Amino acid sequence: MPRSVWKGPFVDGYLLKKAEKSHEGGRKQAIKTWSRRSTIMPQFVGLTFQVHNGNKFVPVLVTEDMVGHKLGEFSPSRTYYGHAADKKAKRR
């Protein structure tokens, strides 16, 4: 179920402030964040975020296609090892 339209997208306030500072200063330094739940805004395009995945920080370069998605979508928190092979079939 999507978020109500009247509420608008959720973004942590400090992320907006850091993005504005980064644009004003012209710095290309990555913005470190634990806020995987924040929505990517148009102001974030071209910036690099380091999004925490529970273990380490994953660098995410924001492009126009990512606007409207969440930061956590681009920083996988689980490792997929594939399905276990059938031991009986393997032995034959």
Swiss-Prot record:
<keyword id="KW-0694">RNA-binding</keyword>
<dbReference type="GO" id="GO:0003735">
    <property type="term" value="F:structural constituent of ribosome"/>
</dbReference>
<feature type="region of interest" description="Disordered">
    <location>
        <begin position="73"/>
        <end position="92"/>
    </location>
</feature>
<keyword id="KW-0689">Ribosomal protein</keyword>
<dbReference type="InterPro" id="IPR005732">
    <property type="entry name" value="Ribosomal_uS19_bac-type"/>
</dbReference>
<keyword id="KW-0699">rRNA-binding</keyword>
<keyword id="KW-0687">Ribonucleoprotein</keyword>
<dbReference type="Pfam" id="PF00203">
    <property type="entry name" value="Ribosomal_S19"/>
</dbReference>
<comment type="similarity">
    <text>Belongs to the universal ribosomal protein uS19 family.</text>
</comment>
<comment type="function">
    <text>Protein S19 forms a complex with S13 that binds strongly to the 16S ribosomal RNA.</text>
</comment>
<dbReference type="GO" id="GO:0015935">
    <property type="term" value="C:small ribosomal subunit"/>
</dbReference>
<dbReference type="GO" id="GO:0006412">
    <property type="term" value="P:translation"/>
</dbReference>
<dbReference type="InterPro" id="IPR023575">
    <property type="entry name" value="Ribosomal_uS19_SF"/>
</dbReference>
<dbReference type="InterPro" id="IPR020934">
    <property type="entry name" value="Ribosomal_uS19_CS"/>
</dbReference>
<protein>
    <recommendedName>
        <fullName>Small ribosomal subunit protein uS19</fullName>
    </recommendedName>
</protein>
<dbReference type="InterPro" id="IPR002222">
    <property type="entry name" value="Ribosomal_uS19"/>
</dbReference>
<dbReference type="GO" id="GO:0019843">
    <property type="term" value="F:rRNA binding"/>
</dbReference>
<dbReference type="GO" id="GO:0000028">
    <property type="term" value="P:ribosomal small subunit assembly"/>
</dbReference>
<dbReference type="GO" id="GO:0005737">
    <property type="term" value="C:cytoplasm"/>
</dbReference>
